[in-house]
């Protein structure tokens, strides 16, 4: 019997899943989460983020993550599980966030004292006391400068998988180097959150895997190497400050003596960590093409495995490395639950009432189209909020209920087509995935079977599964990814929702109508026509 630990350091919490593997029998033996604000109020964070007078700036204290890691390992010991059977540990972390260390970090990591709390030993290793995170949007000027230096956003996207994004690590590094040049000069190593936490476990600088490295605007996606043009355009001497890149199944080394002596852990393998999105790819069982995951949350996200890297020419999608050695595509939509809840509240509905109306309204919504951009949208790029109606009157309750869901599903299908994936199965996650009426529209629009997927933390589960896969590979007994995820990252078999062939055909034709409405709303096309008749419009 072997145990595999998966950790996930998100914006607001640190979660852990411990898998017990005994031949073909596998189960989750331990699951826990530490909410940062509750466990460590002395850092003064709100939802894991430090307060700032600039709403575009978002950062967290890296010592918070250090203290959380030490506490989680203590909780594991207190569980009473046979941790002597721990074979490997890996992790997931919020993507794009960066940690800045000085030249004293290497010796500090290698000489951790098990008699002292971890947080008390490494406070002096930071050249920057805060870590900018994915919520930061303050680097527009840096994005433009980097893109211009490498030949434009199209060139940057072809090489790195994404155009320059404010939250990505490269623009954040450029801002730091420009505004705090002396602190940047004192910086010896710039880690991602994932590689920093892996370094704490291994007691040495850990590499970055291609999955998380591709969220930096710095890595050549096809070669899995740092792209010199991007590193040079970002900051002077940056290449020497970056960790090495290594495959996702690489072993950094054994758990450092700090963990072995203080907590009694064995010399388990520390597997390279990755980002939360690549780990969630594994945790939701997306290990072959043809499957997509749709997360229906505050924001809606579509992601899936791609065997070859393809780039979204509109510049809104992302390509990351996959732990399987292939690639993953991801597209995010900001107006997710916000838009659904807005319609529910505007018409004073309960969720059961919302669902009944949705089920009773015919597919296609009688030609009525609704664009629910209550907030500036990520996909498509809508910088100014505003809703748009085509053939839909403001007081039409039923039309708005179906209109908001059809708009979201059509937008997902249209704006994820760049991935080039022939979809046969969708794993639906997130709060709204409990609504089968919404999932029926999803099945019809994508013309694919939809399954509900019940997993508390797909990122930490994916990290634990990655640890198991890397451990098998290190023992020269590799196991297929299908076998790795089977039984642990499967959707609910009885939740299958099949597409209605008539509705699927209608939505296939409706994509062009929706695209025309979207183009008009964005000022890129004429007033759309449905059945050769220009539709009436109203905007908020």
Residue ranges and their predicted role:
Residues 136:
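Carbohydrate-associated surface elements
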Residues 1-120, 260-269, 443-450, 520-532, ...:
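N-terminal glycine/serine-rich phosphate-binding loop of ATP-dependent small-molecule kinases
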């Amino acid at each position: 019997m072997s145990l595999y630990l998966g950790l996930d350091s998100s914006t607001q919490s640190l979660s852990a899943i411990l898998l017990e593997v005994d031949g073909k029998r596998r189960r989750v033996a331990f699951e826990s989460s530490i909410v940062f604000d509750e466990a460590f109020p002395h850092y003064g964070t709100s939802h894991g983020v430090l307060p700032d007078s600039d709403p575009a700036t978002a950062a967290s204290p890296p010592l918070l993550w250090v203290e959380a890691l030490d506490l989680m390992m203590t909780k594991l010991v207190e569980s009473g599980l046979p941790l002597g059977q721990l074979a490997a540990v890996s992790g997931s972390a919020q993507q794009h966030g960066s940690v800045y260390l000085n030249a004293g970090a290497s010796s500090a990591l290698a000489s951790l004292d098990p008699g002292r709390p971890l947080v008390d030993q490494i406070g002096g290793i930071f050249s920057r006391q805060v870590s900018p995170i994915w919520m930061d949007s303050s680097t527009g000027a840096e994005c433009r400068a980097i893109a211009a230096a490498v030949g434009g956003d199209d060139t940057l996207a072809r090489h790195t998988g994404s155009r320059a994004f404010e939250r990505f690590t490269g623009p954040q590094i450029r801002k730091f180097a420009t505004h705090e040049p002396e602190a940047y000069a004192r910086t010896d190593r710039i880690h991602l959150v994932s590689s920093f936490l892996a370094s704490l476990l291994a007691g040495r600088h850990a590499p970055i895997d291609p999955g998380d490295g591709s969220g930096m605007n710095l890595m050549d996606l096809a070669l899995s190497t740092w792209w010199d043009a991007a590193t040079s355009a970002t900051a002077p001497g940056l290449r020497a400050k970056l960790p090495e890149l290594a495959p996702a199944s690489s072993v950094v080394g054994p758990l450092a003596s700090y963990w072995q002596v203080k907590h009694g852990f064995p010399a388990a393998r520390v597997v390279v960590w990755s980002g939360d999105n690549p780990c969630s790819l594994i945790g939701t069982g997306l290990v072959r093409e043809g499957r997509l995951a749709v997360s229906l949350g505050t924001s809606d996200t579509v992601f899936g495995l791609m065997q070859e890297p393809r780039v979204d020419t509109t510049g809104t999608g992302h390509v990351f490395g996959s732990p399987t050695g292939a690639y993953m595509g991801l597209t995010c939509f900001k107006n997710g639950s916000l838009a659904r809840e807005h319609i529910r509240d505007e018409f004073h509905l309960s969720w059961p009432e919302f669902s009944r109306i949705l089920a009773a309204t015919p597919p296609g919504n009688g030609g009525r189209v609704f664009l629910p951009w209550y907030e500036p949208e990520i996909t498509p790029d809508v910088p100014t909020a505003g809703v748009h109606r085509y053939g839909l009157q403001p007081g039409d309750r039923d039309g708005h209920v179906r209109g908001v869901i059809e708009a979201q599903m059509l937008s997902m299908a249209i704006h994820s087509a760049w991935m080039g994936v022939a979809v046969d199965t969708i794993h639906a996650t997130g709060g709204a995935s409990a609504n089968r009426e919404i999932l029926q529209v999803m099945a019809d629009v994508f013309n694919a079977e939809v399954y509900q997927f019940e997993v508390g933390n797909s990122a930490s589960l994916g990290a634990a599964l990655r640890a198991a896969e890397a451990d098998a590979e290190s023992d020269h007994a590799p196991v297929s990814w299908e076998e790795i995820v089977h039984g642990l990252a499967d959707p609910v078999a009885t939740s299958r929702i099949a597409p209605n062939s008539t509705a699927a055909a209608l939505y296939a034709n409706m994509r062009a109508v929706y695209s025309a409405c979207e183009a008009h709303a964005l000022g890129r096309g004429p007033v759309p026509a449905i059945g050769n008749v220009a539709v009436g419009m109203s905007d908020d």
